[in-house]
Protein backbone atom coordinates (compact mmCIF):
# COMPACT_ATOMS: atom_id res chain seq x y z
CA UNK A 1 0.00 0.00 0.00
CA UNK A 2 2.89 2.41 0.71
CA UNK A 3 4.27 1.91 -2.80
CA UNK A 4 0.90 2.79 -4.28
CA UNK A 5 0.59 5.95 -2.14
CA UNK A 6 4.10 7.06 -3.09
CA UNK A 7 3.32 6.57 -6.77
CA UNK A 8 0.10 8.61 -6.44
CA UNK A 9 2.02 11.43 -4.77
CA UNK A 10 4.59 11.36 -7.56
CA UNK A 11 1.87 11.52 -10.22
CA UNK A 12 0.15 14.40 -8.41
CA UNK A 13 3.45 16.27 -8.09
CA UNK A 14 4.19 15.78 -11.78
CA UNK A 15 0.68 16.98 -12.72
CA UNK A 16 1.10 20.04 -10.48
CA UNK A 17 4.45 20.94 -12.06
CA UNK A 18 3.04 20.43 -15.54
CA UNK A 19 0.12 22.70 -14.68
CA UNK A 20 2.49 25.38 -13.39
CA UNK A 21 4.46 25.43 -16.63
CA UNK A 22 1.37 25.45 -18.80
CA UNK A 23 -0.15 28.33 -16.83
CA UNK A 24 2.87 30.59 -17.29
CA UNK A 25 2.44 32.65 -20.42
CA UNK A 26 5.14 34.63 -22.12
CA UNK A 27 4.18 38.09 -23.24
CA UNK A 28 4.54 38.34 -26.98
CA UNK A 29 6.68 41.19 -28.22
CA UNK A 30 4.94 44.01 -30.02
CA UNK A 31 6.69 44.75 -33.28
CA UNK A 32 6.60 48.13 -34.97
CA UNK A 33 7.53 49.02 -38.55
CA UNK A 34 8.91 52.29 -39.85
CA UNK A 35 11.03 53.17 -42.92
CA UNK A 36 12.07 49.56 -43.51
CA UNK A 37 12.91 48.89 -39.85
CA UNK A 38 11.22 46.29 -37.68
CA UNK A 39 11.72 47.19 -34.02
CA UNK A 40 10.47 46.76 -30.49
CA UNK A 41 9.91 49.27 -27.71
CA UNK A 42 10.76 48.54 -24.10
CA UNK A 43 11.28 50.82 -21.11
CA UNK A 44 11.18 53.89 -23.35
CA UNK A 45 13.88 52.61 -25.74
CA UNK A 46 13.84 51.11 -29.23
CA UNK A 47 15.67 48.00 -30.42
CA UNK A 48 16.06 47.36 -34.14
CA UNK A 49 15.16 43.76 -34.97
CA UNK A 50 15.63 43.84 -38.75
CA UNK A 51 15.90 46.07 -41.79
CA UNK A 52 14.28 45.30 -45.14
CA UNK A 53 15.04 48.53 -46.99
CA UNK A 54 17.18 48.75 -50.11
CA UNK A 55 19.40 51.74 -49.30
CA UNK A 56 23.06 51.44 -50.24
CA UNK A 57 24.24 54.24 -47.96
CA UNK A 58 22.26 53.93 -44.77
CA UNK A 59 22.03 56.27 -41.81
CA UNK A 60 20.34 54.38 -38.99
CA UNK A 61 17.88 56.66 -37.17
CA UNK A 62 18.54 57.71 -33.60
CA UNK A 63 14.79 57.87 -32.87
CA UNK A 64 11.99 55.47 -33.81
CA UNK A 65 8.44 56.12 -32.65
CA UNK A 66 9.73 58.94 -30.46
CA UNK A 67 12.10 56.64 -28.55
CA UNK A 68 15.92 56.51 -28.71
CA UNK A 69 17.37 53.58 -30.65
CA UNK A 70 19.83 51.94 -28.24
CA UNK A 71 20.34 48.42 -29.56
CA UNK A 72 20.61 46.51 -32.80
CA UNK A 73 19.53 42.89 -32.42
CA UNK A 74 21.45 39.90 -33.79
CA UNK A 75 21.38 39.49 -37.59
CA UNK A 76 19.35 42.71 -38.05
CA UNK A 77 21.13 43.64 -41.30
CA UNK A 78 22.51 40.19 -42.18
CA UNK A 79 22.58 39.14 -45.84
CA UNK A 80 21.75 42.64 -47.08
CA UNK A 81 23.50 42.77 -50.45
CA UNK A 82 22.64 46.46 -51.00
CA UNK A 83 24.50 48.00 -48.06
CA UNK A 84 27.76 49.76 -48.93
CA UNK A 85 28.05 52.09 -45.95
CA UNK A 86 26.31 52.47 -42.60
CA UNK A 87 26.29 55.31 -40.10
CA UNK A 88 25.09 54.34 -36.63
CA UNK A 89 23.64 57.02 -34.34
CA UNK A 90 25.27 58.06 -31.07
CA UNK A 91 22.36 56.50 -29.19
CA UNK A 92 23.44 52.92 -30.00
CA UNK A 93 25.15 51.22 -27.06
CA UNK A 94 24.87 47.53 -27.99
CA UNK A 95 24.91 45.35 -31.10
CA UNK A 96 24.11 41.64 -31.25
CA UNK A 97 25.80 38.73 -32.96
CA UNK A 98 26.14 38.71 -36.77
CA UNK A 99 24.47 42.11 -37.20
CA UNK A 100 26.22 42.68 -40.54
CA UNK A 101 27.00 39.06 -41.44
CA UNK A 102 27.18 38.33 -45.18
CA UNK A 103 26.81 42.00 -46.14
CA UNK A 104 29.31 41.44 -48.92
CA UNK A 105 29.21 44.99 -50.30
CA UNK A 106 29.59 46.76 -46.95
CA UNK A 107 32.79 48.81 -47.16
CA UNK A 108 32.46 51.31 -44.31
CA UNK A 109 30.68 51.69 -41.03
CA UNK A 110 30.70 54.60 -38.63
CA UNK A 111 29.91 53.56 -35.09
CA UNK A 112 29.45 55.81 -32.05
CA UNK A 113 32.08 56.24 -29.36
CA UNK A 114 29.50 55.22 -26.77
CA UNK A 115 29.12 51.76 -28.28
CA UNK A 116 30.21 49.57 -25.39
CA UNK A 117 29.20 46.14 -26.59
CA UNK A 118 29.88 44.48 -29.92
CA UNK A 119 29.44 40.72 -29.86
CA UNK A 120 31.63 38.30 -31.74
CA UNK A 121 30.92 37.67 -35.41
CA UNK A 122 29.26 41.05 -35.86
CA UNK A 123 30.62 41.23 -39.40
CA UNK A 124 30.96 37.52 -40.17
List each language-model region with its residue ranges.
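Short beta-strand motif preference
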Residues: 48-49
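Sec-dependent signal peptide cleavage junction
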Residues: 20-33
